[in-house]
Curated annotation (Swiss-Prot):
GO terms for cellular component: cell outer membrane; transporter complex. It comes from Haemophilus influenzae (strain ATCC 51907 / DSM 11121 / KW20 / Rd). Keywords: Cell outer membrane, Membrane, Signal. GO terms for biological process: Gram-negative-bacterium-type cell outer membrane assembly; lipopolysaccharide transport. The keyword Signal applies. Its main location: membrane. It is found in: Cell outer membrane. Component of the lipopolysaccharide transport and assembly complex. Interacts with LptE and LptA. This is LPS-assembly protein LptD.
Length: 782
C-alpha cells in the first residue's frame, strides 16, 4: 500500500484549481467584490463621445475646458469622478488629441478595474493614462492593491512600487510587494519583478520574478511546489512546471528530488482534438538508492495512457493502459495513476464500429498483477473480436432476436499455462408481453463455443484437449408484476408490491477440459471465468460465473419481490427487496464436488433503503444462509445529512470468511477470518470558514482500529489551510499472517484563493474521499 507522507504545499508561486466549490463562501466572497453597474458597451469604446457634467465649467473652444466641483466624466464603460478636470485638445481637426488632467483626487471605474488616486492624466482617444498614489481593485473577481504610479494601456497596465492581493478589504492575510507589476488584461495574468511575499505584513519569501493568474486562462510557468519528509523517501521537494502549449494541449513536468532515492522525473501531457481526448503520463527514477531493488540498481518507472475518441460518425476508440516497472512500485511511490490496493494495473484498448442494429469491436486486454506471492497471473485476451446484432419486433412484434459472437485468443506469461483460441456464438429469441400490471418475458438462448487449445511450452506443462466443442441451450421465463394499494395505517402513503419470479434451465456440460486445472484468485476458471459476487440483484442473473469458460447447469426457480412506499407527492420513501434461488437440481460446471451448489437453495438476500426524512437516510443489505443458520454478509448505514457537506454516518460491515474466500478470493482476506467492522464518519462545516472531517473504523474481530482520521480545514476568501492526521492498517513485504502493521501520517496544505478559476471549496469532500475506507453516501431515494 502507498505510504502517505507529511506534505507541506507552499502556496507562493501560483494557485491550485479546485474541483468542488463551496457555494456559500464563494457567494460571500463575491459580495465583497465590486460589480460593474449598467450594460457593458462593446465595440470600439474609444470612438464613443465623452460626456462631462460639473458644478462649474470654463470652456475655451477649441483648445481646452476646465471643470470644477463634482465633475462626472463618462465615455462608454469608463466613468470618472473628480473635483477638478481639465480637458485639452490639440492637433488638427481630422486627428485631434484629447487629454484629461485630473488633480486633487479621483475615482475611476470601468468594467474591468476600479481605481482611487491623487492625480491622473488620461488620453481620451487611446485610453492610455498615468495615475499616481493609486489604489486599484478588479471588477467581478478578487484582486486589489496599491501603486505609486500606474500607467494604463489598452491591453495592459504597468504599476511601479505596487502591491497585489486577492484578499478582500479588511483582510491582509497575504500580499505580494513588487518593484513593478504588469497586468495583461486580455491574456489574464500578471508579471511581477523583485516580488516579496508577505504574510500579515511580514516578508517570508523573495523571488526576482513571479507570475500570477488574474483570470480564467491557463498560463505557462511554475505551479505550486510541494515538499515533505518520509521514512522511505527522506526529505523531498517537487516543483511542477506547466506549459500551455495550445488551447487544446498542455504539459506538466514535475522534477522531484528525494534525499534517500534520488531524482524522479514526472510528466503529464493532456490533449483535446476533434476526434478525441486523452492523457499520457510517465514517471521515471533512474537509480534507486533505497528499496528492496537497490542492490541491482533497478530503474523504476510508470507509463499511463487514457484515450477516448469518436471519429467518422460511427467509430469509437478507447484506451486505458497503465504499466509499472515492478510489483511494488505503488507501495514505494505515491502516484495518482494507481494504488497498490487495486491489486493490478489495467491494460485495455478497444476500437468499435456502431450501427443501429449491429456493432463490432476489436480489443486487447491484459492485467499486471501486484501480488508478490502469485507466480501465475491472469490470461491476456489479445486479440478479441466481438460482433453484436439485434432485430426487434419480429413476427408482428412478438419476437426479438439478439446475437452475440466472439473470437478471442488467450495466452499467459507462464509457460506452464496452455494457450487457446475461443470462438463463441450466442443467439437468443425472446418474447416480451407487458401491461400496466406487469410483464412476462420468455427467452431461449444457445451458447455455442469452440476451443482450439495448445499445451504450454514449459517443462512440466499439463496436457490439454486440443479441440473442445460445447453447446448449451438455455430457457428462461421471467415474470414481474406491480400491485399497488393505499395504506390505512399510514395515511397519505401508497404501497406497491412487485413480485418477481424467474425459472431458468440449462443442461449440464462437463467443462473441466477447458483451460488448465490450476486455479488461483487471479486465474479463476478456464481463461476468463470467476464466480460473480452475490447480492439480491445477482439472484436474477443468467449465470453464476463471469466470462464464457464456465457456464453452470441450471434448473432453478428464483422467488423475489420488492415493496415500495410512496408519499402523497409520489416520492419513494422506503423499499425492501428480498429473494432466494431454489435449486431443483445441483448447479455444476464439472465433476468436482467443490464446484457445485452444495444445498437446495441459495442464501436469502435482502436490500433496503429508507428515506426517513429529508435529513435522515438508512440503507441495509443482508444475506442469510438457511442451511447453516448463519449470516454470510451484512451492511448497514445510518446517515444524518441536513445540508450539503454536513453529515454524520454510522455504519456496520460484516462478511464471514467463507463468503470472502468464495466471492473475492483468499488473497482478499489477509487474516483468514471473518471481517466485522463498525465505523463512524463525520463531516461538518463550522460557520463558513471551518470544516472538520473525522473517520474511525474498528474491526471487532481483530479488536483493533482499522482506520483513524481527523482532518481540519480553514477557508477564507483568499487562503485556505488544512491539517490531516491518519492512522490505518497497511501491509509490507514478507508480512506474517497475524501481523498488524499501521501507517501513521500527517499532512499539511496551504493554498491561495481567489486567483484564476480558483473556487472556494470547503475541503470536506476531498477529505472524505481519502483513506483506505472512503466515505460512501447512504443511498438516497431522491
Amino acid at each position: 500500500m502507498n505510504k502517505k507522507h507529511t506534505l507541506i504545499s507552499l502556496a507562493i508561486l501560483t494557485a491550485l484549481y479546485s474541483q468542488q466549490s463551496l457555494a456559500d463562501l464563494h457567494e460571500q466572497c463575491l459580495m465583497g467584490v465590486p460589480k460593474f453597474s449598467g450594460e457593458v458597451v462593446t465595440g470600439d469604446v474609444n470612438a464613443l463621445p465623452v460626456y462631462i457634467e460639473a458644478d462649474n465649467a470654463e470652456i475655451n473652444q477649441p483648445n481646452d475646458a476646465t471643470y470644477q466641483g463634482n465633475v462626472d466624466l463618462k465615455q462608454g464603460n469608463r466613468h470618472l469622478l473628480a473635483q477638478s478636470v481639465q480637458v485639452k485638445q490639440s492637433g488638427n481637426q481630422s486627428t485631434p488629441l484629447r487629454m484629461a488632467y485630473v488633480r486633487n483626487g479621483f475615482d475611476y471605474k470601468d468594467n474591468q478595474i476600479n481605481m482611487l488616486g491623487k492625480d491622473a492624466e488620461f488620453n481620451l482617444d487611446s485610453h492610455d493614462g498615468n495615475l499616481t498614489n493609486s489604489e486599484y481593485e478588479f471588477v467581478g473577481r478578487q484582486g486589489r492593491g496599491k501603486a505609486d504610479n500606474i500607467t494604463l494601456h489598452n491591453n495592459y497596465r504597468v504599476m511601479k512600487n505596487a502591491t497585489f492581493t486577492s484578499c478582500l478589504h479588511g483582510d491582509n492575510a497575504w500580499a505580494v510587494d513588487a518593484s513593478e507589476i504588469r497586468q495583461y488584461v486580455k491574456e489574464e495574468y500578471a508579471e511581477m519583478w523583485h516580488a516579496r511575499f508577505k504574510i500579515h505584513g511580514v516578508p517570508v519569501f523573495y523571488t526576482p520574478y513571479l507570475q500570477l493568474p488574474i483570470g480564467d486562462r491557463r498560463r505557462s510557468g511554475l505551479l505550486i511546489p510541494s515538499a515533505g519528509t518520509s521514512s522511505q523517501d527522506g526529505l523531498w521537494y517537487a516543483q511542477p512546471i506547466y506549459w500551455n502549449i495550445a488551447p487544446n494541449y498542455d504539459l506538466t513536468f514535475t522534477p522531484k528530488y528525494m534525499s534517500r532515492r534520488g531524482w524522479q522525473a514526472n510528466g503529464e501531457f493532456r490533449y483535446l482534438t476533434s476526434i478525441g481526448e486523452g492523457k499520457v503520463a510517465g514517471e521515471y527514477l533512474g537509480k534507486v538508492r533505497y528499496s528492496e531493488y537497490a542492490s541491482d540498481n533497478r530503474k523504476r518507472h510508470l507509463f499511463y495512457w487514457n484515450h477516448n475518441s469518436s471519429f467518422l460518425q460511427n467509430w469509437r476508440l478507447n484506451i486505458n493502459y497503465t504499466r509499472v516497472s515492478d510489483k511494488r512500485y505503488f507501495n514505494d511511490f505515491d502516484s495518482i495513476y494507481g494504488r497498490s490496493t487495486d491489486g493490478y494495473a489495467n491494460q485495455y484498448a478497444r476500437i468499435a464500429y456502431y450501427q443501429p442494429n449491429y456493432n463490432f469491436s476489436l480489443s486487447a486486454h491484459q492485467f499486471q498483477i501486484f501480488d508478490d506471492i502469485v507466480n501465475i497471473g491472469p490470461y491476456r485476451a489479445v486479440p478479441q473480436l466481438d460482433f453484436n446484432y439485434h432485430k426487434y419486433d419480429l413476427a408482428n412484434g412478438w419476437l426479438n432476436f439478439k446475437l452475440h459472437s466472439q473470437a478471442v485468443r488467450f495466452d499467459n506469461d507462464s509457460k506452464l499455462m496452455p494457450t487457446a483460441w475461443r470462438f463463441h456464438a450466442e443467439p437468443s429469441l425472446n418474447s416480451l408481453m407487458s401491461n400496466k400490471y406487469g410483464s412476462l418475458n420468455i427467452e431461449t438462448k444457445l451458447y455455442a463455443t469452440r476451443y482450439e487449445q495448445k499445451k504450454g511450452s514449459g517443462k512440466n506443462a499439463e496436457d490439454v484437449q486440443k479441440t473442445v466443442n460445447r453447446v448449451i441451450p438455455q430457457f428462461k421465463v421471467d415474470l414481474q408484476s406491480v400491485l399497488a394499494r393505499d395504506i390505512t395505517f399510514l395515511k397519505e402513503y401508497t404501497q406497491t408490491f412487485e413480485p418477481h419470479v424467474q425459472y431458468l434451465y440449462r443442461p449440464y456440460r462437463n467443462q473441466s477440459n477447458i483451460g488448465s486445472t490450476l486455479n488461483n484468485d487471479y486465474l479463476g476458471f478456464g481463461y476468463d471465468s470467476a464466480l460473480v459476487q452475490q447480492d439480491y440483484y445477482s439472484l436474477f442473473r443468467d449465470r453464476r460465473y463471469s466470462g464464457l469458460d464456465r457456464i453452470s447447469s441450471a434448473n432453478q426457480v428464483t422467488l423475489g419481490g420488492t415493496t415500495r412506499f410512496y408519499d402523497i407527492a409520489g416520492e419513494e420513501r422506503f423499499n425492501l427487496s428480498a429473494g432466494q434461488i431454489y435449486y431443483l437440481s445441483n448447479s455444476r460446471i464439472d465433476e468436482n464436488p467443490a464446484n457445485k451448489t452444495p444445498t437446495s437453495s441459495s442464501a436469502w438476500a435482502l436490500e433496503s433503503n429508507w428515506k426517513i426524512s429529508n435529513k435522515w437516510y438508512w440503507r441495509g443489505s443482508y444475506q442469510f444462509d438457511t442451511h447453516t443458520n448463519s449470516t454470510s454478509l451484512a451492511n448497514t448505514s445510518l446517515e444524518y445529512n441536513p445540508e450539503k457537506n454536513n453529515l454524520i454516518q454510522l455504519n456496520y460491515r460484516y462478511a464471514n470468511q467463507e463468503y470472502i474466500d468464495q466471492n473475492l478470493g483468499k488473497s482478499a482476506n489477509a487474516y483468514q477470518q471473518d471481517i466485522q467492522q463498525v465505523g463512524l464518519v463525520v463531516g461538518w462545516e463550522i460557520a463558513n470558514n471551518w470544516a472538520v472531517v473525522g473517520r474511525y473504523y474498528q474491526d471487532l474481530a481483530l479488536q483493533k482500529p482499522v482506520e483513524q482520521y481527523l482532518g481540519v480545514q480553514y477557508n477564507s476568501c483568499c487562503w485556505a489551510a488544512s491539517v490531516g492526521v491518519k492512522r490505518n492498517v497497511t501491509n509490507h513485504q514478507n508480512q506474517t499472517r497475524n501481523e498488524i502493521v499501521y501507517d501513521n501520517s500527517i499532512g499539511i496544505t496551504l493554498e491561495l484563493r481567489g486567483l484564476g478559476s480558483n473556487d472556494h471549496q470547503s475541503g470536506i469532500q476531498e477529505m472524505l474521499e481519502k483513506g483506505k475506507l472512503p466515505y460512501i453516501r447512504a443511498f438516497s431515494l431522491d
